[in-house]
């Protein structure tokens, strides 16, 4: 309200149109906010589950910690930390593009089954499980952050519409309407006075 308001019929029509557009757009924003809130809750659960899975895989891998330092098997273990294939796509959720992890393939180290202890398979499997689960957990966290950021942005816009734009526009309309109504009454009064003077002059 600090800026100058043009108290004209054109301004009234423009503000009326603006208010109608705000009123039409607000439900769409509120719907998007509700959808994002649901998606964020789902993403929170997925991120928590992925993190828990990764932590469990880490604990299983740490059970073999003493074996990691055996020089004979170090190369095989290190190869399990290398990613051969990482297939990612983009998924649109409530208008937000988030990363979709489709497939993770790690390097399969070559070693002689006859010349290695039976526990090596379990060791390498635990390493692979940890690496893959960590990648999925990081992807889930990235999705969550993107959805939370969009929810924050949409929430700000909803608040802007509800608490500033719509009330301010409504107040402006009311002010213009009162001014135009008062001016109309004044104009009518002036016209009556003018007619009366003309009539008196004729007499």
From Swiss-Prot:
Keyword Zinc assigned: no
GO biological process: proton motive force-driven plasma membrane ATP synthesis
InterPro entries assigned to the protein according to its UniProt record, in alphabetical order: V_ATPase_D
Cystine bridges: none
Claim: Ribosomal protein is one of the keywords in the record: no
Keywords linked to the UniProt accession: ATP synthesis, Hydrogen ion transport, Ion transport, Transport
GO MF term (any one): proton-transporting ATP synthase activity, rotational mechanism
Role noted for this protein: Produces ATP from ADP in the presence of a proton gradient across the membrane.
Similarity comment text for this entry: Belongs to the V-ATPase D subunit family.
Protein name (record): V-type ATP synthase subunit D
Species assigned in the record: Chlamydia trachomatis serovar L2 (strain ATCC VR-902B / DSM 19102 / 434/Bu)
Phylogenetic lineage: Bacteria, Pseudomonadati, Chlamydiota, Chlamydiia, Chlamydiales
Chain's gene name: atpD
């Amino acid at each position: 309200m600090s800026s100058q308001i043009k108290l004209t019929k054109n301004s009234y029509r423009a503000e009326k149109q603006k208010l109608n557009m705000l009123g039409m757009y607000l439900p769409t924003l509120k719907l998007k906010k509700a959808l994002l809130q649901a998606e964020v809750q789902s993403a929170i659960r997925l991120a928590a589950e992925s993190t828990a899975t990764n932590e469990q895989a880490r604990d299983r891998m740490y059970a073999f910690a003493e074996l990691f330092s055996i020089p004979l098997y170090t190369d095989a273990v290190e190869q399990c930390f290398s990613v051969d294939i990482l297939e990612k796509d983009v998924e649109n959720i409530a208008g937000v593009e988030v990363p979709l992890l489709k497939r993770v393939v790690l390097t399969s180290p070559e070693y002689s089954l006859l010349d290695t202890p039976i526990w090596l398979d379990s060791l390498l499997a635990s390493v692979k499980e940890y690496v893959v689960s960590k990648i999925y957990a990081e992807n889930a966290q990235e999705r969550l952050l993107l959805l939370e950021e969009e929810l924050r942005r949409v929430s700000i816009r909803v608040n802007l519409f509800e608490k500033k734009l719509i009330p301010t526009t409504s107040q402006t309309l009311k002010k213009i309407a009162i001014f135009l109504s008062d001016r109309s009454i004044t104009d009518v009064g002036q016209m009556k006075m003018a007619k009366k003077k003309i009539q008196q002059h004729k007499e």
